[in-house]
Amino acid sequence: MSSQAVEALKLIHKQVEKVIQQIDDGDWARDSLCEGWRVQEVFAHMSSNMKEAINPTPPPETEQEPLKAEDAMEALVAPRREWTAQELLDEYAQYFESWIEWMTALQEEPTASTMVPLADLGTYPLHMMANAFAFDHYCHLYVDILAPEGPLVIAVDSGNDEMIRPGIEWMIAGMPQMQAQELAAVVTRPLEIELTGPGGGTWTVQPAGHDGLITVPPRANLGASATVTSTAHDFVSWGTKRSDWRSTCTIDGDEAYATTVLDTLNII
């Protein structure tokens, strides 16, 4: 199950609290690395997701087409764009503990193994919601908000294995479904991904099977045409197209093939 991901969320929260204690008034309006969002919108995204899990907004009276994941996130952020920083912090504080309790409950069977669709991201067991948010919060804090990639120079603890690994597991789990057609078209031979440092491991991206989906088993030595190596932390950035993989990855083997796959990859 994903109890480790719940613990990751608690650890990341401690670092969020350090940012809250040190952030200046002017920092809220600074552009984050997340395209189109200031630091304020990143916090609004985090707090609004907690609120919706615990106290969901009633659905519209008239049936509407389901939103894509990124559009749904923007829909929650939009009404909070003009909130004060204190209003965002109050919402975050109000719902965090209940949200963690909810995440913990999702680790218990039979709920944990219940498969649910997540907009256009694919279908996953409910226990992996904790992994999804461990990825989300780590990425937004350590990549979008904090230097060197984000705008704020604030002292926090470095990301460790306990913080990073659950989010990496979400990224790997999402690769087959989030870009099902795009990746199936370009993954024609095994490609090894070796992530070093905290949160790291080795996976081999395999061509699509009869179901049309690639697979990403957690092992190496599967006849890979190339091996792509970077830190796990950097994977959070380049795997989501926040940065160019060329700045942090090395390739051993068929560089042209690896380049085609990496240029296509875009995890949400």
What kind of feature is each model-predicted range?
Residues M1-A44:
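An N-terminal domain-cap segment
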Residues L9-V16, V39-I54, A78-A85, L89-M103, ...:
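Alpha-helical transition-metal enzyme core signature, strongest for iron centers
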Residues T196-S225:
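Acidic/His-leaning functional-site neighborhoods
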Residues R219-I268:
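C-terminal interaction segments
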Residues M1-Q4, E52-A105, E109-T114:
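Short, helix-capping/interhelical loops that line the mouth of catalytic, cofactor-
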Residues R165-P207:
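A glycine-rich beta-turn/hairpin centered on an aromatic-Pro dipeptide
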Residues A29-E70, P117-Q179:
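Short, contiguous alpha-helical
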